[in-house]
Design a protein with these regions (language model features):
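Membrane-embedded alpha-helical bundles of multi-pass transporters/translocases
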Residues: 2-445, 450-451
């Protein structure tokens, strides 16, 4: 009888609606991931007329600022155990901070006269810094909150699917609406009107997703689910982070894997990269961007099912390694096809021409390699997130301390620092081909017209 009680109480299972709704928190923050990291350099240089070098470096610089805020907020979360739980306050407050800062940044700072350029620089930096704090508040909950949601090894792999669905609702919605909205403004992505419209759209989507995520974790966000000794709060000093990393080998390996996945995603979905690929190279941004984006999502569906099945049978580590390998092989194939590319000949992407369907062998091969590669990669991109909960459980087992905030922000710290390099990598690559600024929608339209 005693054994049965212990066994039953040791497994914390989530209800279906909780597994579905809580991961929408990641979708809510991914709205801002696209809204800020994909466009803020263009906004700073084209709308506010700031130095392009300054605007680009700020993307990396603010990620370094995240290095300071992450451990502080993680420690603060682990000390929080109030009336509204441990995670819900950070989710709501973080989202409101981001909404306010982005609304002011994108809608009000362009009003500052060009003669007060110093004020523009100061406002840009200050509002960007405030946004970073809000972003850290909310993103840390996605990783940390899983520890209270479920510890069932059969359920945790399912988090990847629902997390990706949430990401699609957030990131996918922004990637879908952005080019549509850009067409309505002269200057496209470089116009102030584009940002004034896109910001409120993103904020509304993010708030709705956050509210649903709060509902998902509401029942679980209480002390009885806070691991061993959940009634007490852990007071871990920031300097103890080093010892935690040093003694938690699984967390070390997960940081490397997760950071690599995020860096690859950030580069692959960068607006400049997509504009150069579909617009400058293939000469048909409007006809290729959305179809290829949808194609990648369609190919990812079977891989989601495969990764979950493999995770439940062989473990999440084995699943991650297997399907990332598939993605790597396919992306090598994409690279070879791009090296063979030639404008105006058979080695170029072509889906719809002037006379209707115009698919060639090059396009078929590109679709196969890109589709399978993107599908396999996208299905594994969020797998490190539920694995953070496993590392947190291991830390509780190893040291007896329930510190999900610290574990989540440790992972997030490395994840953000590495992914922030994407803007730098793209910027360096662009400079090598002789461009002085990111490719905008206007630039590629002019390029297509003259081609």
């Amino acid at each position: 009888m005693g054994e049965q009680k212990t066994t039953a109480s040791s497994v914390n299972r989530a209800k279906t609606y909780q597994l579905v709704l809580f991961p929408l928190n990641n979708g809510a923050t991914n709205v801002y991931y696209v809204l800020v990291l994909s466009y803020i350099a263009t906004f700073g240089s084209k709308v506010l007329a700031l130095s392009m070098l300054f605007a680009s470096v700020m993307v990396t610089g603010m990620r370094l600022f995240d290095a300071v805020t992450d451990p502080i907020i993680g420690a603060l979360m682990d000390r929080t155990n109030g009336r509204f739980g441990k995670f819900r306050p950070f989710m709501v407050i973080g989202n409101l901070i981001m909404a306010a800062s982005i609304l002011v940044l994108y809608c009000l700072t362009p009003i500052i006269p060009a003669s007060a350029m110093g004020l523009r620089y100061a406002a840009f930096v200050a509002l960007y810094a405030v946004w970073v704090i809000g972003y850290t508040f909310q993103t840390s909950c996605t990783r940390s909150g899983q520890t209270v949601l479920t510890n069932d090894p059969k359920q945790r792999p399912l988090f990847t699917i629902f997390n990706t669905v949430g990401s699609l609702l957030g990131m996918g919605a922004m990637q879908f609406f952005a080019p549509i909205l850009a067409k309505n403004y002269e200057g496209g992505y470089a116009s102030a009107g584009f940002f004034r419209t896109l910001a409120p759209v993103g904020i509304v989507i993010s708030i709705l997703l956050t509210l649903l995520a709060v509902i998902g974790i509401w029942e679980k966000d209480q002390p009885k689910y806070f691991g061993i000794g959940g009634e007490k709060t852990e007071k871990i000093k920031v300097r103890e982070y080093i010892q935690i990393i040093k003694n938690n080998d699984p967390m070390q390996r997960l940081m490397v894997a997760g950071a690599g996945c995020k860096l690859a995603l950030s580069i692959a979905t960068n607006t400049t990269v997509l504009c150069m690929l579909y617009g400058c190279m293939m000469g048909n941004y409007d006809g290729l961007y959305l179809p290829m984006m949808v194609l990648g999502y369609v190919f990812s569906v079977p891989f989601f099912l495969l990764t979950v099945r493999t995770s439940q049978k062989e473990g999440q580590k084995a699943s991650l390694m297997k399907y990332v390998s598939v993605a790597l092989v396919c992306y090598v194939g994409v690279l070879v096809l791009l090296l063979l590319w030639g404008r105006g000949d058979a080695f170029t992407l072509s889906i719809l021409g002037e006379n209707g369907l115009s698919i060639n062998l090059y396009t078929i091969l590109f679709i196969v390699f890109f589709g399978i590669g993107y599908g396999a990669y996208y299905a594994t991109a969020d797998m490190p997130i539920p694995m953070v909960a496993d590392c947190s459980d291991y830390e509780t087992y190893r040291s007896g301390k329930y510190i999900p905030g610290i574990m989540g922000t440790l992972f997030s710290l490395v994840d953000k620092l590495v992914s922030s390099l994407s803007a730098t990598v793209v910027g360096i690559a662009v400079s090598f081909v002789g461009l002085q600024s990111p490719v905008s929608y206007t630039h590629l339209r002019a390029h297509e017209t003259s081609a």
